[in-house]
UniProtKB/Swiss-Prot annotation:
SUPFAM superfamilies: tRNA-guanine transglycosylase. Substrate binds at D90, S91, G92, G93, F94, D144, Q188, G215. InterPro entries: ArchSynthase1/Queuine_TRR, TGT, TGT-like_sf, tRNA_ribo_trans-like. One of its GO terms (cellular component) is cytosol. This is Queuine tRNA-ribosyltransferase. It comes from Laribacter hongkongensis (strain HLHK9). Gene3D superfamilies: Queuine tRNA-ribosyltransferase-like.
Amino acid sequence: MLEFTLHKTSGHARRGTLRLNHGTIETPVFMPVGTYGAVKAMTPDRLDETGAQIILGNTFHLWLRPGLDVIGTFGGLHDFTGWHKPILTDSGGFQVFSLGDLRKITEEGVHFQSPINGDKLFLSPEKSMEIQTVLNSDIVMQLDECTPGQVDHATAKASMQMSLRWAERSRRAFDDYRNPNALFGIVQGNLYLDLREESLKGLTDIGFDGIAVGGLSVGEPKPEMYRVLREVGPMLPADKPHYLMGVGTPEDLVEGVANGIDMFDCVMPTRNARNGWLFTRWGDVKIKNARYKDDTRPLDEQCSCYTCRHFSRGYLHHLHRTGEITGAMLNTVHNLHYYQELMADMRAAIEADSFAGFQQEFHAQRARGA
């Protein structure tokens, strides 16, 4: 089930609600990534406290470990993981295509060797829909092919057209499995506007509950990513949620929302947290730097997260330098809270029809330095 309601716009920025089988989401929204069914260094209650409304699970990795038999025993990911709010799962395609020489792409699907034990496996649109039906994720993604950041037009066109054929097969299999959740199609076409338009038209003809923009933030220059976003964003259907996959930095999120994107996911806040790279409204803090060893201030004096309420930069510096797992946990709490607060601030700015002013203030603050 999916019901999307658009409440307000400010320029191209959109404020909406997305009703799913496991809850209602306020958009625009950021989805923390729980690759193996857990957001790294977080428990579900801590994740909830950051303001997270929905998380992402990885179809490829969950299929390999623990496997469908195990997750099926629990009736899906929600009871297995203890996260009872909505979950989106990707199709598994990106991970398979990242295997390089270990995989072979055909019209039928992708043959590959398991990176865990070397088993020969096959992922098709139908198999991806089967896996995601067992996972019982609230939002299911079609299987698509993601090209590298910059390829020639002919290569991008052939890949995009195969993704469209896979989209049709994904739609058919999703319906055959009587999956009660929502299915999103994925716009591909690399950096070429004509291919993106052809892809979007094909997906619209097939019929999906939401539309994702894929194939960005995969190695192309940032100005090119923003160009495609500015061209494609306003073309997306107004009555469906728009999802920008695998993006990104705080600046990327603001740029995405400015161009009509409603949903984002990225490993950046959690991965960077474990590496001591912390986001604040005043710019980024690399907590390993010696300048923070006796800094008594919190990361951000205006942040209300557990980490900023209780701990100093000096203590976080110490935890990172000594490799304490508590440091990774506290850093992750802060980064995810920062991302969720950023989304809440954008929702409020759209409601007040002041998003352009918010953008200016956001960039000015981030440039100031922490």
